[in-house]
Structures are given as C-alpha cells and as structure tokens.
Amino acid sequence: MNADLPKNSKVVVIGGGVAGCSVAYHLAKLGWKDTILLERDQLTSGTTWHAAGLVGQLGSSSTITRLRKYSLNLYKELEKKTGLSTGLKQNGAITVATSKERLQELLRQATAAQLFDVN
C-alpha cells in the first residue's frame, strides 16, 4: 500500500472522518491538486460513524449558526453534484417550555432564528 503513495505532497490530511473529508473537499474545491487524504480504514468509519449526525441550524453564536447553515446546504449540494446520498434527512423538532424561564429562552431562540433566517 505504501508503494502507491507519493513520496511528497503539499498537504497531507490525516483522518477520513467528517473533518478530514471536509478539509480535503474544500482544498480540492479551491484548486489544490497536491493533496493526500490518509485513512487507516474506510472513510468515516471511526468516530464520525458513531456520531448521531445531527445538524442543528441555530448555534450559540452567529459564526456557529453560519457554519451550521453552510454545512446543511453543503450536504444538499453534494447529493446534487455526485448523485450519491449523504443520508441527510431533515426533520423538525418540538420543544415545550415547562417554566416561565424556559419560555423566555425559547422566545429568545425564536428571535435569533428569525434574525439568522433559520427555518
């Protein structure tokens, strides 16, 4: 197997989980051609495989919210570009406030969701 690997590369991404695959994908999208992705087994077969795979849309900051929206759109885009299923299933959620404090928190989240155009 080592004989198949080049001796040099500008970028070596170690780990074929969601983070490593994302880095390799985005580098390729930016035109980087001298990139290697190393994974000891199958892609996404480690920690990523064990994760629940939930992609919430509203984050604790505007940066996290933008990243989550980008990720959700990327999964949809990848399915269109490749014709392969990412396994993305969009489901809603219902949260019930059982106290006045929790109601205020949910109202704050609803306002933030509107501000960031989160559906």
Regions found by a protein language model. Give the residues of each.
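Hydrophobic alpha-helical packing residues
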Residues: 27-28, 113
